[in-house]
């Protein structure tokens, strides 16, 4: 998975949208992959990152206004976008989407 993330973020500006459980997990994998140009975290609530790993923090009610300032946005599943996903210029991805990029041929869906 790290190889897919590394390729996706290489030399790009990256935003983590939502800093709950999945956002923190994305932050760990992005740091592990490295190679990004800049990183930021956007969340409705005030957040902090651990020392030694600086990231620009965008917090408050307008936290979604910045999406098109970034090349790649890692969106947490609980975040409802303010606009249709196709109205953004940035590439918006999720952990689930990256999982299917990597393991899609090995997955079988079972319903009801």
What are these regions (language model features)?
Residues 1-111:
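Short, basic phosphate-binding NTP loop
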């Amino acid at each position: 998975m790290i190889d897919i993330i590394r390729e996706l973020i290489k030399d790009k500006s990256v935003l983590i949208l939502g800093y709950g459980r999945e956002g923190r997990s994305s932050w760990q994998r992005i740091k592990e992959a490295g190679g990004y140009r800049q990183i930021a975290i956007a969340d409705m609530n005030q957040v902090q990152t651990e020392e030694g790993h600086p990231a620009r923090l965008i917090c408050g009610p307008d936290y979604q206004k910045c999406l098109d300032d970034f090349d790649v946005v890692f969106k947490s599943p609980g975040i409802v976008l303010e606009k249709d996903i196709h109205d953004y210029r940035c590439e918006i991805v999720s952990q689930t989407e990256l999982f299917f990029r990597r393991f899609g041929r090995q997955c079988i869906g079972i319903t009801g």
